[in-house]
Amino acid sequence: MTARPRVLVSAYACHPRPEAAHFPGEAILGWSLVDEITRFADVDLITWAFNRPGLEGTFTKSEGRPAAVHYVDLPPRLHRALRDRHYGVRFYYFLWQRQAARFAKGLARSESFDLFHQITFSNDWMPSFIAPALPVPFVWGPIGGGQKVPGELASTLARRDRRRERSRTLLQNVWRATPARRRAARKASAILVCNKETEEVLARWRDKVVAFPVNGIGREAIAADAAPERRGGFRLLYAGRFDPIKGLPLALDALRILRTIAPAVTLELVGEGPERPRLEALAARLGVADGLIWTPWSPRSEIFKKMRQSDVFLFPSLRDGGGAVVVEAMANGLPVVCLDVGGPGFHVREGSGIKVRPGRPDVVAAGLAGALGRFWCDPGLRDRMGREARDRAASYYAWDRLGERLRGIYDDALAGRPPRREERP
């Protein structure tokens, strides 16, 4: 890439302060990637009007990184759809995308662009309505959507949650069969995918598919070294929502097994969510309630401190597409034990943690306990894997490194070349 191209970016979620955003994980992805893109391209950003307070004044020509921000909104009467975190949010985004497509078509009649990139709220089954209308190369993603709860582990969910998962899969398959989705995939010059399940769903377009994480980390958040600040005992940490898909019943059963050889082990659960009463009841039945530390959701800096003081990060999520907290644990020199599914399975590689294959719940719980037991028996393993995890976060997940990779993907798209495939982490 020689001259700065002009890029039209759609990032529905895009905000520099995730705590003030409606969708924190998506918002920081949108903000961070757009921030990196402005280093080598002139950007016109289309985003949701909700982000205006956080974005105004952030991209200015005085910084030498020009960006024009265009806000698109829907009528206030439709905002109530956002209260339903499952279907309402996607329905609202579908309508927003149609509105954004009309705006983009009008903008393209008076402005000239070299490339279009759709970043946030991207998944393999929801098509881009903007891309097919623009006569320029299209970069799609990073996208997820292919991940789903492994069949045998669905039994760990309550009945209502199993019904919801079946409805989710049905809805996705209907969308995948639409002409609009096929048009978007055909139009794309590069499709960035954030987990292996989504890559498999897109096998028909594998020549366009590039592994690219949906999570990153700022340089300031990467620990200077990976040496743990141990406080004694054997401390496990989980941070995130207490939601059905997080697999926490497996974590509690693994703790029960682990305590047969490590009776002093503790598991700190940082977060909140609707599953807590069910988890408390399960912990009492399993006899592990006295080994749990329940901590309300904490500021990011406090969670990072806890990561530095823990031995292992336990994250048995059943179908997370990304898993930003896994990257944050790695950046703080904390090895990860997770299932080999979705985003966590994408992030953790040999040497930076231990992944357990999905299967029957009792077998998976035993596998998690066995992985944790390895760290209990060999403190040096925690140090070695912690260093590898921290180094991997710095070399692959730092936002500036992801920006460099994105620049190469743009180069290929603008030159009409297939994207260069790189090693998945």
Predicted regions and their residues:
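N-terminal subdomain of nucleotide-sugar transferases
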Residues: 1-67, 190
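Aromatic "clamp/platform" in nucleotide-sugar-dependent glycosyltransferases that forms part
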Residues: 318
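Donor nucleotide-sugar binding/catalytic pocket of nucleotide-sugar-dependent glycosyltransferases
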Residues: 70, 170-225, 231
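Short alpha-helical donor nucleotide-sugar binding micro-motif in glycosyltransferases
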Residues: 297-298, 305-310
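Nucleotide-activated donor-binding/catalytic signature segment of Leloir-type glycosyltransferases, i.e.
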Residues: 278-298
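A conserved mid-protein helix/loop that constitutes part of the nucleotide-sugar donor-binding site
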Residues: 28, 234, 241-260, 274-280
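Short hydrophobic beta-strand element within catalytic cores of glycosyltransferases
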Residues: 335-338
